[in-house]
Amino acid sequence: MPAVSSAHRAALDALATDLERVFGARFVSLVAYPPAGRDDETHVHSLALVETLGFADLHACLPMVAGWQRRGLAVPLVLEDAEFRRTLDVFPLEYGGILANHAIVRGRNPFAGVRVDPNDVRRACELQAKSHLIHLREGYLETQGEAAAVARLIAASAAPFRALLTHIARLPDASHGSAENVYEDAAVAEEAERRIGISATLVREVLASATSGQTSIADPTALFSRYLAAVEQVWEYVDAWRA
């Protein structure tokens, strides 16, 4: 996990103390993790695992929420430890991302012996890939071919495209295993080219549009055409993948 500032570390320690006060001996652990996308990098995300969780516990946390947010923390995801383990198959991408990239703030290691079934990851990736493809097709029709609108569509879709490729990188690969530490754009692009065969240059162009803005795209329609074909190839890869 990327390093957090000393201020955020202090805020996480304070959060852990608050949760220990609420849950007492039922507190299991608090882990910090980066957001799945890049739209909320100003807040530090965390997962709190406890033995039992009820309405009274949530109500007891209410007076502390504003303070957490003022210190730059997102409201923590609070789950029962057993609940987390039982729903790994329901949220394989979300929980798999936390397993792959986290830092323990306080408590025991809650992930010892825990793994996400690669087949669950594949099914979730297939849904994500097909949804992305459908939304791009629909979005292109809505642009009516207007170049600026096409550029906006590409830029708006870059973050979910990046997330999709990052999730796919965690699927075991026969020749190279899984790439669970692929986070930077350049690494995401290179892994997509190696594994799926889509152009790393194309991936970098699409991802760059999210940060540099759609005005940086010289020929939006030409880029979109290649982008759409690449997403079709991504879906075909995930559809055919087998553990």
Region locations from a protein language model:
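A nucleotide- and high-energy phosphate-metabolite-utilizing enzyme signature
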Residues: M1-D13, F23, H102-G107, A186, ...
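Metal-dependent nucleotidyltransferase catalytic core
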Residues: M1-V22, A36-F91
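Conserved NTP/Mg2+-binding pocket subregion across the NTase superfamily
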Residues: A3, A7, V65-R152, A156
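Short gly/ser-rich loop at a beta-strand->alpha-helix junction or flexible surface loop bordering the NTP-binding
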Residues: F27-A36
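Short acidic/histidine-centered micro-motifs embedded in hydrophobic/aromatic stretches
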Residues: Y33, N101, S209
